[in-house]
């Protein structure tokens, strides 16, 4: 690409990729007017009318994106899957979304060598770590799919907190989906099972099933409520009619007492975070009409200023707090949303997004990008991977991803 010899339409170009986008459905929805933004992008750029591209095998994220970057098949560029075998260690797999495995040249190296400033942002195939030391190259992550920083910066999982006057004590339940497609549910462990009646009461507000219906289903051998089993090897859980990729905590709701500053009619509950290693406290507050519709979360009852105040139905973004992961403390940001609350304050559901380390710069090149992004755009945004049919949870997930897209836009 020589500027003095080739006539070009623009000195700036953007290559935009969307993982898993079906070209047939996209073309159909563009033509039907259902994807106006994609239509604008198509009108501004270049692509086949049917949007079909020549892919490669296997049809999974890392090799496909690397093929797009290098113009070579996986058998040539070397990134063939999410993981790879390690010579001499047949019982171990290595992470494969790693540019150091590349045996082909990605396009951005060619751009930088031709004198063009190039930003590679969240390209999950051959982008990280940088394979070019040019001062024209800027890289923001690319170490994993999901969203920017999802592998390197996430220091706590998403969490659903349920509180009710019917719950006897605060309990933390580690997430049931980690790297599996289906949850690991451990059943029939002797003498270490919660009482089914307590579980039914405590989780009724999450499942939408009353205790009688829940008991009937349990008698049929169908696990539809949260049942916790704990042994020396860990936890297995299931919550409601959806399987979750997040942790869960439940808490009793009581009359507020012992606070430095709390209204006389306030109620309180406990937030167990980070596998129960961090405890926060919440006040349930009335509005002017005497209806409970707001939650305020504090570090402790001694504090007079809350970490966050959550009116029902409104996402609160970038709440900064401590997070503990693997015995290390991080200063992290996450979002809070009070999804529902009963008018009498007897029951509530609170969603917390994953937490992101605000001081991590390990997947940015050059590292000064971390400070520039933090000051001009904001903390790296959490992502959401809730696979659920619950409408409230779906809406919360959409709001989390909308914020991710806003962050991307501001970054550009």
At which residue positions do the language-model features occur?
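Short, structured active-site-proximal loop/turn typified by the sulfatase FGly-forming signature C/S-X-P-X-R
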Residues: 26-75, 117-119
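Beta-strand elements within well-structured catalytic alpha/beta cores of enzymes
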Residues: 8-27, 41, 68, 111, ...
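A short acidic-Thr-Gly-centered motif at the start of a beta-strand
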Residues: 1-9
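A short acidic (Asp/Glu
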Residues: 25-29, 130-133
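Short, mixed-charge, low-aromatic patches
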Residues: 22-24, 62-67, 355-362
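His/Asp/Glu-rich, glycine-adjacent segments
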Residues: 73-411
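Extracytoplasmic/secreted proteins, especially bacterial periplasmic and envelope-associated proteins
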Residues: 25, 33-37, 63, 106, ...
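Generic signal for short, ordered secondary-structure residues
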Residues: 5, 17-21, 47, 89-90, ...
């Amino acid at each position: 690409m020589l500027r003095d010899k080739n006539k070009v339409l623009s000195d700036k170009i953007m290559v935009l990729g969307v993982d898993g986008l079906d070209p047939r459905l996209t073309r159909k929805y563009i033509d039907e007017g259902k994807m106006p933004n994609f239509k604008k992008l198509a009108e501004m750029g270049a692509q086949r009318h049917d949007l079909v591209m020549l892919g490669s095998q296997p049809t999974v994220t890392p090799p496909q994106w690397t093929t797009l970057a290098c113009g070579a098949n996986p058998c040539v560029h070397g990134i063939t899957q999410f993981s790879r075998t390690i010579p001499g260690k047949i019982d171990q797999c290595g992470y494969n979304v790693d540019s150091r495995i590349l045996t082909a040249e990605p396009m951005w190296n060619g751009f930088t060598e031709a004198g063009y400033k190039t930003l590679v942002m969240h390209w999950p195939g051959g982008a990280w770590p940088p394979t070019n030391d040019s001062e024209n190259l800027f890289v923001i992550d690319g170490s994993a799919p999901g969203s920017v920083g999802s592998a390197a910066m996430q220091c706590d999982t998403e969490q659903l907190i349920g509180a009710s006057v019917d719950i006897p004590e605060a309990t933390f339940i580690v997430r049931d989906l980690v790297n599996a497609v289906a949850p690991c549910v451990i059943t029939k462990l002797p003498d270490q099972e919660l009482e089914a009646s307590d579980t039914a009461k405590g989780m009724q507000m999450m499942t939408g099933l009353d205790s009688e219906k829940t008991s009937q289903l349990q008698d049929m051998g169908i696990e539809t409520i949260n049942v916790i089993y704990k042994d020396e090897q860990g936890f297995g859980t299931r919550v409601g009619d959806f399987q979750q990729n997040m942790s869960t905590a439940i808490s009793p709701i009581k009359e507020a007492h012992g606070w430095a500053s709390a209204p006389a009619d306030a109620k309180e509950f406990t937030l167990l975070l980070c596998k129960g290693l961090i405890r926060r406290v919440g006040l349930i507050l009335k509005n002017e009409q005497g209806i409970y519709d707001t939650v305020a979360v504090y570090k402790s009852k001694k504090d007079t200023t809350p970490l966050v105040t959550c009116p029902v139905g409104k996402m609160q973004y970038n709440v900064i707090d401590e997070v503990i992961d693997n015995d290390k403390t991080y200063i992290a940001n996450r979002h809070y949303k009070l999804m529902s609350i009963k008018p009498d304050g007897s029951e509530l559901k609170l969603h917390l997004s994953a937490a992101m380390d605000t001081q991590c710069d390990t997947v940015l090149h050059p590292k000064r990008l971390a400070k520039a992004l933090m000051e001009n755009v904001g903390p790296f945004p959490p992502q959401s991977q809730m696979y659920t049919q619950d409408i409230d949870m779906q809406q919360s997930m959409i709001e989390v991803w909308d914020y991710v897209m806003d962050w991307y836009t501001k970054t550009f």
